[in-house]
Amino acid sequence: MGEIYIETCSEIPRFRACENSVDSSEREKSPVDETLRYETWDVFTDRRFAGNPLAVIFGADVLSGDAMLRITREFNYSESVFLLTPRAADCIARLRIFTPGGELPFAGHPTVGAAAAIARQRGQSDEMVLELPAGRFRVRVAGQGDVWHAEFENPNLPAVRADGPDALRLEAALGLPEGSVATESHMPRRCGAGIDFFYAAAPLAAVKDARLNTAAWDALSLDDACGVLLYAPAAPGSGADWHVRMFGPHIGVPEDPATGSAAAGLPAQLMASGELADGSYDWWVEQGIEMGRPARIRVRFEVRSGRFESLAIGGDAVAVCAGEVRWES
């Protein structure tokens, strides 16, 4: 496959879900083999140029996995999502999600952003099912114009997988003074709800001051976990419950402005730390502030008899721009 080109447009058109914008006869006559439409969205925010940017590529059935990865690297966002024809009859689209480092079975802000993009082109609030490698995700979407809100039910409930890296190594990797990372009830652990992260608690000031040390990061043994979520209770009056930062340079994401999949696993870490009793929870997680891209992620879940019964992740998304991705064979 040859070069990839991305062409922007001044207006954001409304597209049919999973539809290639160039029909087969046009492709046969053109030296450009394929032309696909894309939109960019800022997710977990209701205003442009905040939250986590996302590229949504429509009609991606014609793309190989290698082409998807190359396009993702061209956009150079934390993630891009590709919409394909679903295999399951009850699903409106099938999603493939890529970071610059490779494909993920699930991620939060691409799921929210894809649902918002589909609902916007349909011009109506909707309930839909999206097909991902990590399962079928039921999503409720509401909004109008360019601003939408989506919340998905995660079929993968939070769980603790293993203990985390040594606190001293985490402190070195995140540029924190010795003693910053909690080592008792909030000791580092590997948790996940679809994909795994390592979770580490620190005082709020330390979370805000963390700076990635790539040399020390390379000494961490993260296996196939996607990154480290550093967390603390949010400041009073912030309107949030938790203040977090997610670092994942080994997957091509030095720091992520908003990580719905990491927020989804946070309840498992809090339960293992003795923080959760039975009941219904409705959290707001703030992220991206240190990057100048403030984001808010809603995490709703229920605990019964010490077990997670449900989990939903939600947030706003706003359309930013649109255009075409073109490449020649």
Question: What do these predicted ranges mean?
Answer:
Residues 7, 23, 27-106, 112-329:
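Active-site proximal loop and beta-alpha junction motif in alpha/beta enzyme cores
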